[in-house]
Amino acid sequence: MQMADLEKKLENSVLPPLLKRELSEKILKEEISEEYLVDEIISETIRAYERTLVEPGEAVGVVAAQSIGEPGTQMTMRTFHYAGVAELNVTLGLPRMIEIVDARKEPSTPTMTIYLNDDFKGDREKASMVAKNIESTNVESVSEDISVDLINECITIVLNTHQLESRGLTVADVIESIKSKMKLKIEDHENVLNLKIKTPSLKALRKRLPKVRAIHLKGVQNIKRVIIRKEVDEYILYSEGSNIKEVFDIEGVDTTKTTTNNIVEIQDVLGIEAARNAIIYEMDATLGNQGLTVDKRHLMMVADLMCTDGVVKPIGRHGIGGEKASVLARAAFEETVKHLYSASMRGYVDELGGVVENIIVGKPIAMGTGCIDVCIDKTYEEGKEL
């Protein structure tokens, strides 16, 4: 049996293109040559596919909401340590689920899972080098003490040589970075730097102190810490903080697998389709972490709804809930008086096309048998049975 023969058999079937291709590849891989067996496999696949289809008029939104919401009541409310990674806090459970559906611009604990290229992933030293290049280093993180010297009227930085060496920096690098960010006169006394300004005063020195501490020396902005962990036969990096755009530019990073839990950042860097996949993955992982299983199609429906306009929108009054076409549906969700008052002022007419608004006015909803109109042929003969 050749691929062309299988394609011909599946050409007019109801199966989607991806399923057709996967089925063909599976039949060829198993080397099934008997035509009656191939026909039986195709028929059974079509029957199984048709059983999974949603019935016309099914309330898929309500079913999805119930299927996700009911297990959600069993979820924990706390922030946990990420399994197997020491000292790295990650928000899990219900708070994480709320973050996802609210499309928060910044998660409470942004993290990245950074995979390495083939040349780096098996070598601990190379993985450590990539981690050092990613981890953000500022003046404070390589200093033993940063304080205002009232006698000499300057800011004194006592550098930690061990920290400098471990992060691949020198005193000259620190001086150069400070000079590029601030107009200061720097006196170098081995590992002690004195920073002086033109018109010194206690107020002026104290004002500059936080800025000096925060001067960026090396690494990726917003990545506070990177942890290396060996999983099976490769090293994987876990970061505290997220900046996927800059991390992708670091040598040794596998851009095809590296990801972040910041969905809005994924949308900005990789696009809306990647953000949709991230929403599905994050919801599934959050539920799975609690030992809960929800059919992925319910999660896909939520993700599709959030991403349908090309940008990630929250499910709530500031997003999808507040953009419903029906005035009554918007009023029933939240901010009732605001929506009714605004609609009255503008003379809006509610077409009663949805579910909520029909329930409010006591009409049958367009769902299940309610979405079917029975049509009678008026030309039938009188007395003849239909």
UniProtKB/Swiss-Prot annotation:
In short, the EC number is 2.7.7.6
Q: Which GO terms describe its cellular component?
A: cytoplasm; DNA-directed RNA polymerase complex
CDD domains recorded for this chain? RNAP_A
Q: Name one GO biological process term.
A: DNA-templated transcription
Q: Which UniProt keywords apply?
A: Cytoplasm, DNA-binding, DNA-directed RNA polymerase, Nucleotidyltransferase, Transcription, Transferase
Coiled-coil annotation reads none
SUPFAM superfamilies assigned: beta and beta-prime subunits of DNA dependent RNA-polymerase
List the Gene Ontology MF annotations in alphabetical order: DNA binding; DNA-directed RNA polymerase activity
| Pfam families with a match to the protein in the record | RNA_pol_Rpb1_5
Task: State the compartments where it is located.
Answer: Cytoplasm
Reaction catalysed? Answer: RNA(n) + a ribonucleoside 5'-triphosphate = RNA(n+1) + diphosphate
Give the source's domain of life in one word.
Answer: Archaea
- Its chief place of residence is cytoplasm
Task: Quote the NCBIfam families the UniProt record gives.
Answer: RNA_pol_rpoA2
The free-text function statement in the UniProt record for this protein reads: DNA-dependent RNA polymerase (RNAP) catalyzes the transcription of DNA into RNA using the four ribonucleoside triphosphates as substrates. Forms part of the jaw domain.
Which family is it part of?
Belongs to the RNA polymerase beta' chain family.
Record's subunit section? Part of the RNA polymerase complex.
**What name goes with this protein?**
DNA-directed RNA polymerase subunit Rpo1C
Q: Please give the organism.
A: Methanococcus maripaludis (strain C6 / ATCC BAA-1332)
